[in-house]
Amino acid sequence: MQGLMDESSPHEKYMQIRLTAFLCTPVLTELSAMTTEEREKLSHDAADYMNSLGSSKSLQWLSSKCTSEAMLEELKEGLRLLADVGKKAKETNTVLMIDAEYISINPAITSLALALALICNTDSAVVWNTTQCYLKKSYHNIQEEFKFAKANKIHYGAKVVRGAYIVPEGEAARLGGYPSPVHDSYEDTNRSYDRIVDWLLTEISHNTGKRSVRFILASHNKKSIQQAILRMNDLNIKLGENKVMFGQIYGMYDYITYALSKAGHPAVKSMAVGSVSDALPYLSRRSQENSAVIDGANEGRQLLKLEVLRRMRIR
């Protein structure tokens, strides 16, 4: 809660949260094992529970799904905390971006993110779920989320990333003897990312109703960013509407962020908050998610060198 400002601001703020900070992995794993229909029911019933401030009995059917009563109680406690964060986000004009995390718990994360969206996205898009484009089912998954938001008449927001767990997910599939859920190549992931961004931009351009559609293109890939900007121009998506955001990690690819901001695009920096031991694994995964990160760093150093030389000449 300390990451949410106490006072509202005319400027929109952004905060990333991980549901594993609210619920333990075993609970999320069990919920992820449920059927698609059960997880959709979970979204509605969890929203009802959060809306009732924990007094609703809508989650009692989960007693037969959880291996222990303690797990169900942990779910309820986690939802009460999540409801508090959602309420604070609405009060302080803060967008909550829900991290996707590992595929073994991602279905439950999506269900609970949609539950929070049901209670927070009635007036604007406060809760944005994350789509990991390295997954083969990513295009299908984001379309299903979009349909859910449309059917329930709530505003829609998304965070689009390539994904930070490519190596461990592929290794887990190999050791487990099941087909890898991730795309076979980095090029396939790029195509997946650009396809999803193009689809979202098209939905934004076709959206004439009161229900807003927004997303953040979280990427260090110049080609994807350039393609998105060209597509925005083709679709006449105006900058001042803030329907499309751009984001990079704090301390990485600053020249891209600054160039976007200078051109009038809403651009933000993502910063990990916590101890060094907590933050380093997070940043390491983000480095792995883009195979061009080293080349990009070299390019950044070259640009920095040119800027230093330019300033020396000015003096």
Question: What is each model feature region?
Answer:
Residues M1-R315:
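Positively charged, amphipathic and often flexible ligand-engagement surfaces
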